[in-house]
């Protein structure tokens, strides 16, 4: 039913993937989705958000979002399979040496900055292996795009460090 759709790149969202320079430049960008006749695809989440923001503006409302995104870091076993063993046993706002995730979070934040995304802060959360990265307030579409990019960056940086990133609310 929806096999023929068109992607319309939003050039303002282009960003180099900093972890891919050894394979030539690779970028990510977001797109709008339409049917071949140009009508918007009803399940295009960016399109849905744009329409919601436009509807709110017509009603006199404007929004800014400042996300606090959390994730857990888990160890892998000798075969590279995910375990249920957290990377550390630190608690809220701990620092090294208890917070073994500190350098991974730093690498995540620096990678995001290279991509033009400005994290406001990062810290260890309450649970073992639980981390949080906070973002500055921005418009809804940028906040959503940044959240999607964040998921990819966290998974990639975790894997590069021999870890697994889990975004479940309570994986332990």
Model segments located where?
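Glycine-rich, acidic/polar active-site loops that bind/position phosphate-bearing ligands
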Residues: 1-172
């Amino acid at each position: 039913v929806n096999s023929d759709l068109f992607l319309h790149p939003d050039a303002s969202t282009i960003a180099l993937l900093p972890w891919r320079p050894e394979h030539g430049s690779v970028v990510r960008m977001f797109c709008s989705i339409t049917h071949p006749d140009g009508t918007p695809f009803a399940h295009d989440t960016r399109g849905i958000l744009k329409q919601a923001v436009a509807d709110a503006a017509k009603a006199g409302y404007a929004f800014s979002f400042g996300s606090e995104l959390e994730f857990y870091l888990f160890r892998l076993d000798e075969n590279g399979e995910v375990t249920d063993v957290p990377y550390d046993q630190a608690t809220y706002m701990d620092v090294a040496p208890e917070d073994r995730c500190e350098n991974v979070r730093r690498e995540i934040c620096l990678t995001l900055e290279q991509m033009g995304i400005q994290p406001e802060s990062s810290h260890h959360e309450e649970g073992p292996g639980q981390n949080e990265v906070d973002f500055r307030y921005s418009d809804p579409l940028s906040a959503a795009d940044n959240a999607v990019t964040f998921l990819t960056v966290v998974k990639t940086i975790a894997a590069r460090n021999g870890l697994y990133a889990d975004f479940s609310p309570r994986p332990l």
